[in-house]
UniProtKB/Swiss-Prot annotation:
Similarity-based family: Belongs to the universal ribosomal protein uS13 family.
Stretch list, region Disordered: 94-118
Record-level Gene Ontology MF annotations: rRNA binding; structural constituent of ribosome; tRNA binding
Record organism: Legionella pneumophila subsp. pneumophila (strain Philadelphia 1 / ATCC 33152 / DSM 7513)
Protein name: Small ribosomal subunit protein uS13
Entry function: Located at the top of the head of the 30S subunit, it contacts several helices of the 16S rRNA. In the 70S ribosome it contacts the 23S rRNA (bridge B1a) and protein L5 of the 50S subunit (bridge B1b), connecting the 2 subunits; these bridges are implicated in subunit movement. Contacts the tRNAs in the A and P-sites.
Classification lineage: Bacteria, Pseudomonadati, Pseudomonadota, Gammaproteobacteria, Legionellales
CC per GO annotation: cytosol; small ribosomal subunit
Assembly description: Part of the 30S ribosomal subunit. Forms a loose heterodimer with protein S19. Forms two bridges to the 50S subunit in the 70S ribosome.
Length: 118
């Protein structure tokens, strides 16, 4: 297994799909990376040479991925909460942020029903 950005990349998968195992890299970014490094996207990871893997590592190092990206996202949410803006308040209360209805539905965000006491 190749190790890129602290993540074990599966050997048996195509490069484009295998790179999506890294948090912050989707299919589009993966395709762009393959194009920049001149790697055929349909090649399996096990068939890549050490030089190709190293060039992939250097390109991925230029992108914010994994722990750094998680930290940035967390800090952005914390900033919204500290500002006290609408989105920050919704985060704080554990409610949907983007205008969805909450009278019914929104169970994923709100959690399980509390139940009515009679």
């Amino acid at each position: 297994m190749a190790r890129i950005a602290g993540v074990n990349i599966p050997d048996h998968k195509h490069v484009v799909i295998a790179l999506t195992a890294i948090y912050g890299i989707g299919k589009t970014t993966s395709l762009k990376l393959c194009k920049t490094v001149d790697i055929d996207p349909s090649v399996k990871v096990s068939q890549l040479s050490d030089a190709q893997l190293e060039s992939l590592r250097t390109e991925i190092a230029k992108i914010t991925v994994e722990g750094d990206l998680r930290r940035v996202v967390t800090m952005n949410i914390k900033r919204l909460m500290d500002l006290g803006c609408y989105r920050g308040l919704r985060h704080r209360r554990g409610l949907p942020l983007r205008g969805q209805r909450t009278k019914t539905n929104a169970r994923t965000r709100k959690g399980r029903r509390k139940g009515t006491s009679s």
